[in-house]
Amino acid sequence: DYHRIANIIYLGVLGNGERGPARWKNRFFERYQEALRFGDICAHAENEILTLLDMGGISCTVLESCGIRDLYHIHEIAANSPLRLYLDSESYSLAKGYLVDLGYETDRFYDGFGEHMKRVSGFEVDIYYKIPFPVRLFEKQMLYLLEHAQVRSTYQYVRTLPVEDQFLFRLAEAACHYVTDELLIRELLDIYIIYQAWQAQLNQEYIMKKLSDFHIDELAGKLVQISCMWFGTKKDAVFGLLPEDMGVFDVLENRMLSRGAIMKETDTQAACLLQLIQKEQDRERHRKKLERVRKKAKECWQRFTRRLSWIFPEYKYMCAIYPVLEKIPFLLPFCWIRRDIRLLLGMFR
């Protein structure tokens, strides 16, 4: 029951003022006020960013927008989620410059992917120069989906994904967050809301095929199903199928709610995905370690060459000290020795 009404808990606590602890009431009231303010600015701020990028001829693809708020019956219940944009490396730098001009500041970096920027008003934007997936397979499949992105109406350079591909992106991200114990209930709520709103429009055969390409068709189906069980009814069928073994969902629920503290994973796709992520992380750590070694070796070599050039200066410099070298160049080694001996004697005097 709690999970079924979790999306309206803020309003529920506000309406039960006598029994609710004061600290809870204050926090929920602050959260609700933030949601109200965000609702006033999000559409304008999003259009402002996209219009500016479009006028600058900067091509970008919208991965997520605040448009999901329109799918909630009460808009303030939706999360204050950021606008998420994917750009190529060249456009990324230009877009960041435009955002800085609009008053956005970098709040945190996504190592190897992009950064999170926010403005004092509260609106936030994520910009990526690389698809934010920790697995190469997911990145490759997502790049295929981006090829189907369509130009957004009223824009020339701003693209958006079809509804099926938007849903696939959220499912792929949720699968990654699940196996790394970072999946939030809010993400599942958004998936449920989207599935219920777009169910009639979704090409389920296409979605299942693409999920198979991601190798998460079974795992993604379970995540959508458990979101329906939490926020809808247990009778909701995902992709036309009803679950046979309800114990599977107890495993998912325990892992998600405990953030991995209670983990008895039985899903083979989840186990394989976790192995892939760990391999990518190991590969990235090895790459960074190798990069540090190369950087240190380069610095050592530069120090060595500087010392070497001090001991054995170039020919033109030596000619300025010993003009005879211009007529007899083969005396250069003897001049080096003579100069270095004089310098050493000068140090010991």
Question: Which residues does each predicted region cover?
Answer:
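Conserved NTP-donor binding/palm subdomain of two-metal-ion nucleotidyltransferases/polymerases, i.e.
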Residues: 1-81, 87-349
